Amino acid sequence: MASEGPREPESEGIKLSADVKPFVPRFAGLNVAWLESSEACVFPSSAATYYPFVQEPPVTEQKIYTEDMAFGASTFPPQYLSSEITLHPYAYSPYTLDSTQNVYSVPGSQYLYNQPSCYRGFQTVKHRNENTCPLPQEMKALFKKKTYDEKKTYDQQKFDSERADGTISSEIKSARGSHHLSIYAENSLKSDGYHKRTDRKSRIIAKNVSTSKPEFEFTTLDFPELQGAENNMSEIQKQPKWGPVHSVSTDISLLREVVKPAAVLSKGEIVVKNNPNESVTANAATNSPSCTRELSWTPMGYVVRQTLSTELSAAPKNVTSMINLKTIASSADPKNVSIPSSEALSSDPSYNKEKHIIHPTQKSKASQGSDLEQNEASRKNKKKKEKSTSKYEVLTVQEPPRIEDAEEFPNLAVASERRDRIETPKFQSKQQPQDNFKNNVKKSQLPVQLDLGGMLTALEKKQHSQHAKQSSKPVVVSVGAVPVLSKECASGERGRRMSQMKTPHNPLDSSAPLMKKGKQREIPKAKKPTSLKKIILKERQERKQRLQENAVSPAFTSDDTQDGESGGDDQFPEQAELSGPEGMDELISTPSVEDKSEEPPGTELQRDTEASHLAPNHTTFPKIHSRRFRDYCSQMLSKEVDACVTDLLKELVRFQDRMYQKDPVKAKTKRRLVLGLREVLKHLKLKKLKCVIISPNCEKIQSKGGLDDTLHTIIDYACEQNIPFVFALNRKALGRSLNKAVPVSVVGIFSYDGAQDQFHKMVELTVAARQAYKTMLENVQQELVGEPRPQAPPSLPTQGPSCPAEDGPPALKEKEEPHYIEIWKKHLEAYSGCTLELEESLEASTSQMMNLNL
């Protein structure tokens, strides 16, 4: 160290402005690895001359003073050993070694830190002896500039102090056996140590000191320029010495600190006070024995003891320091003190950044230590930097969302990687937290780069792989209570079922049928054929085989004659049953002209003409029935009946569709019509039908349980329940009248309310048609009875049904009759009374309707 240049007169003093506020840093100290060792750290008494002296008022609490201890004492009394006065091996305390020229005590600059609202646990420290010294012009200007900069860069200094402490502490570590002297010299116009440590511009950063001596001592002889200034400092008294316990072979870090809060003291530092009467002069720093203070570690804590060092003080050989004073730079010893001019003369805020740079000579000297210590120091330095940057990274850095389903969407992962490659990282060293913050702010404004085409292709591939084994047509899921319709359904049924979807099923209505729920296929599976359908298909196959075998025309003629005979056998019992009891009176009242009037029905013209020509043609075989007019029919076909049936069915269908649109559930419960052989037979057994309409051209299936047997069963149930049954319209025409695209064989009517006129007219026309059919049969029978014997065999089946009533010829008994013909004969006698009652009721109802119309 070197002395300053010319001084100003002592009368000139500078007082601090009231605007200047003290700043107490949160953490003060250098990170020095203190080793727990029983060896004492010898602190030479000559170093006391370079400490500013501040005295504390007496306190009530017990503290350890050096005068209370005997020289060479190794332990403290147990009552003084507490958690507040023991030193933790890692509790660091900064010290400053200043020359006497840098010590200025300004009146009125004492700050009280014992305010409970601001700093709890701080002790009140006042200067008992306020010493004023003249300041040079450079120091005045420097101080004014510093006070202005401190107010302006308050927050910046706080941040820099935290970072600088971490970097400096790592720089001053060296190999084992070497010593580092950290000298912090700042303007002593600031009376408190915390405010001094915040002033980064005037701080003196110590460089590496490599020495092999176990004891570090220095005197004023090494710095002759300082001896003259010591004469002016006779009034200044000793200050308490602060020092962390350290082994002899490790580093020594000395920093000046005037005030230390009790909270920091409790962490492991010990307060050592000297007698205020003690004083150290320049003569004490000579080769004579000097008084040193030692801090030694004991199981009870750290112990301070004063000893007399007999060794000669050795000047430090390698001391590199940074002094922020221009006048000292020239007079310092170049071998002992290395002062970079760029750092010593810097007073702008950039000086804080320059302090972080390690001097080249310092690097070369520090490299002489062991590599192990340097690795430790570098590792700790990295940890410090990571701690300082982690505060910002936690707040600002946010990871982008990860795409975990990389297997399902591989293109998304590729797009994200491509985007990460484009964005190159900037300022990876110190400005990385700030850049991360900026990137996060601007991330929402950047256009999102996603490969939508790749996403769509990936989804399509996944769907194709899933549905590869399934059918190409999708499955429709009906969420509600109404089933979903297929596109192929008819227009009328589609309208009705779509109306069902508007109104949900009422679960409280127990009479309502249950609606289908769940899944339904657009194209339903092929239903298994019923027993009736199986019989029909079987007979069709047999007929085809028979036609293939008998391809000759005589075979066809024989088949036709057999069909005609069987048709006559089937029809005449029915005709006898229906026309005998019901239409006898009408046959008498209506002559055979009605038979002529029904000759020209449009669709049945051929069979009607054949029936009309049977009377005059006595020589030919009487053929009444055909494929369009089956033998189960018991009435003559006419256009009037067909038109009346068509009007009735259309009206009932209109009523039913209107009800479905208003209330589908109610329309389902109160239906007007039912279609099909099986459904009609089912409701006939339940006695819910009021009328049955049968198509006259149903297919001929004579097997047991076949179509003919089912039709006869339906007619039988209708006769039992006195229900009128009408033969009208062929199958296709009957389906068209019901707005169906398929042919319909049988239709059952539940209720004809609203269409009574059409219904009664249909019944009247049906009764007349039966009478005409009965008259035709009587005429045919009379003609066949008067026929000679050769014509008897072909007429036997036609005369069979009427023989029981008229004592027919004995040839009838020789002919075998089918089983169902015998059943019809029995029904003829049993149902004669029922048919009469039905006829009377129909006549009464028609007469009432006529009276109402009048």
UniProtKB/Swiss-Prot annotation:
One GO cellular component, as annotated: nucleoplasm
Region annotated Disordered, chain positions: 332-351, 356-394, 417-445, 488-619, 787-812
Coiled-coil ranges from the UniProt annotation: none
Annotated motif Nuclear localization signal, positions: 380-387
Biased composition (Acidic residues): 560-572
UniProt tissue specificity: Expressed at high levels in testis.
Signal sequence annotation: none
Disease in which the protein is involved: Thyroid hormone metabolism, abnormal, 1: A disorder associated with a reduction in type II iodothyronine deiodinase activity.
Function: mRNA-binding protein that binds to the SECIS (selenocysteine insertion sequence) element present in the 3'-UTR of mRNAs encoding selenoproteins and facilitates the incorporation of the rare amino acid selenocysteine. Insertion of selenocysteine at UGA codons is mediated by SECISBP2 and EEFSEC: SECISBP2 (1) specifically binds the SECIS sequence once the 80S ribosome encounters an in-frame UGA codon and (2) contacts the RPS27A/eS31 of the 40S ribosome before ribosome stalling.
The name this protein goes by in its record: Selenocysteine insertion sequence-binding protein 2
Native source organism of the sequence: Homo sapiens
Native organism taxonomy: Eukaryota, Metazoa, Chordata, Craniata, Vertebrata
UniProt gene name: SECISBP2
